[in-house]
Amino acid sequence: MFKNMTLLGTLIEHSDGLPLLETNMKNMHKDHNQDASLTLLASKYNVLFPGIYMPMTLENASIIRLVKKVYETGGIIGIVAQKKEDVEATSAQDIFTIGTTARILKLINLPDERVRILLQGEEKFQIEDVIAETPYLLASISRLKDKTSNTQSKHFKAVVSSIKETVAKLISLQPEFPTEIKLLLDNINDFNLLTYFLASGLDTDIKSKQKLLEIHDSKKRGTVLLKYLLKDLEVSKLRKKIQDKVHTDIEQLQHDFYIRRQIKVLQEELGENEFEDEIDELRAEGEKKQWPKEVADYFYKALDKAERLSPNSADYPVLISHAELMLELPWSVYTTDNMDLKMAKKVLDTEHYGLEKVKERLLEYLAVRKLTQNMKGPILCLYGPPGVGKTSLGKSIAKALNRKYVKVSLGGLHDEAEIRGHRKTYVGAMPGRIIKGIQNSGSSNPVFMLDELDKITDLRGDPAAALLEVLDPEQNQAFVDTFLEVPYDLSKVLFIATANQLDTIPPALRDRLEIIEINGYTIEEKLQIAKKYLFPKQRKENGLKATDLSIHDTAIVKVIESYTRESGVRELDRKLASLVRKVGKAMVLEEPYPKKIHKEDVISLLGIELFDQEMYQQTHLPGVAIGLAWTPVGGDILFIEAILSAGKGKLTLSGQLGDVMKESAMTAFTYLKANTNLLGIPDKVFESYDLHIHLPAGAVPKDGPSAGITLFAALASLYTQRKVKDKVAMTGEITLRGKVLPVGGIKEKILAAKRAGIKEVILSKENKKDIQEIKQKDIQDLKFHYVEFVEEVIQLALQPSKVEAAKDWSITKKRKQQPGIGHVSTL
């Protein structure tokens, strides 16, 4: 009974004793006209009864303004209960038709812009008609009066007596019941007030309370109230029975504990307490540890708890395994870093070709570590395509630093407990992978490789969010594993993450990473990697010596260009392994084999070529332009073909183009039409001919903005009948103002242009910095043109004169077809 004790406390605080309530009840019907209009306020969780106080918390701004106005003017407001708690009452259908008028006794502004009010119920009313529903409910009402029963009748006296008796029993079952409320109940002489008071405190639903409010006959209301009180009494008796049983069980547990302690003492006297020796051994090991006081206190507290438990208890092995983990962790144990920068550089160069940015960053870290001993470990993220050596670089870094190496594969990880650990209460609980890796390494400053960071999933919890604490240099000096439950310092750990793409890494996590991009290898770099690392490794793994087999550079280049298409070298490694195995098989079978593999031997050993290199193709037709494309496995060149045919100005795009590339084509076409005077193109050509733009290799999806200037060059060539210059390629985005914007993937595109035989490249002026990052020996035969506007592209890309047999677009005679071809690129 009286679940809402706050309500009763409010009543006691503001009633000032019974006479105030009696006076309110007697004067309740004064100075109010019948059928008056009244502003309504909906109550979600309770029913206000006449003569009763009730607090309410308001959040709606318009309702708060209304209530403040009523409070300041000392007016009254109608309180009606909502039919449903989970919706806002905005119409008459959402509320009951009978409510209680009220005065606002107190109004408090809360810090979060909400308002809390204290209401005093006065008299009941019935809604006759809703006048308005916005901004708040306004209704015409009629006042309702309770029907007073014959207080001298035997039935009435029996009801009153039963109610008071039942309430007394309820109070006796609840020792915590406030004394003030007991006194208040004993002194209420007005039966209506008594029933309303008890109804307001009933532990029942809002519909039952509304039912009591709507009963105007006091004797009938008392009878219904008595039923609710009797039901509440049965529930209270059952609750008391349960509480008594729980109390008895607790006493039994205490008794059992006392008996177990006696048994333990007897076991000690008999020398049978073998588990005590185990705990003593753990405590002795703990005394040898150099760990923080907080950790030591926790460790000894856990051992004390285990000592009090029976070895057969379910918690005992958990506490022991937890203590063993704490002992096995390398608290304050660090390996000594190799501070010889030259030696570290030699180790990195010996095992990995290229990757200059990563090596430079690592040497910077070592240099600063040499200058200061308190530097926190950086959080590096090696970002690049598969197979470029991101993961294997971790081992080399650990070797160069003279540190332990730990690798955790995050691909497919979907449970944050894998990172942060499980609670000890779970069956089979264990620490997370971070603490487990530290435990296995035996050092608190290993090189910790977090492989495939971009492939974490979040089916259960959010493992990426769990990594935020691990990878934040400001927080990881006190990382708390859920199983370990004490802080562990990860600030000296060198975390290195790897990722193939950044867009799948949450922004908050990416912000904590120092991103180092590793681009795909050039053919020259792949050649050097194959000569120095891959081929010798495969030869050794397959049981051959250097005197048995060698390979010519041209053969390696043949394998790279015709049998692999990747940014890294994984497939190249597999193809070289295949070459070595085939030679090894021939040796065992005593068949003839080449002791040095040349270019001509590759096809006979590996079979037909798998890939054709896209090469520049000379054409005499206008409407053809060469673009540069970026793909996940490197760069390539693509052709744009454009053709005009008799029609009505329709634009057709083909070649499986994405939305961005289609928009680039429309932008180029629109700019061309808007600037016909620039190229001397007659306006009528756009109305008399259909334009078709096509990108060959239609099965391959193409998208990106970098084909903008290539599309424009192809269209300008077609409409002016001036051919694009030989061996010229271009890349760049265009705008409707004719401005050329920078694009990405420049290194891969430029290397692809060189492989294809291109001699000149046109690109945005803002991409000049990207060219400067490419090794000069890789681009020494290329000439670069940097442009800001498409007018410059026309001067650089198109021949000054028209082709032979150039078409005259001013002649509008219908033709079967106007030849003119072209090719496009993607980003």
From Swiss-Prot:
Keywords: ATP-binding, Cytoplasm, Hydrolase, Nucleotide-binding, Protease, Serine protease, Stress response. Residues 619-800 form the Lon proteolytic domain. Its EC number is 3.4.21.53. ATP binds at G384, P385, P386, G387, V388, G389, K390, T391. CDD domains: RecA-like_Lon. Induction: By heat shock. HAMAP family: lon_bact. ATP-dependent serine protease that mediates the selective degradation of mutant and abnormal proteins as well as certain short-lived regulatory proteins. Required for cellular homeostasis and for survival from DNA damage and developmental changes induced by stress. Degrades polypeptides processively to yield small peptide fragments that are 5 to 10 amino acids long. Binds to DNA in a double-stranded, site-specific manner. This is Lon protease. It comes from Amoebophilus asiaticus (strain 5a2). The gene is lon.
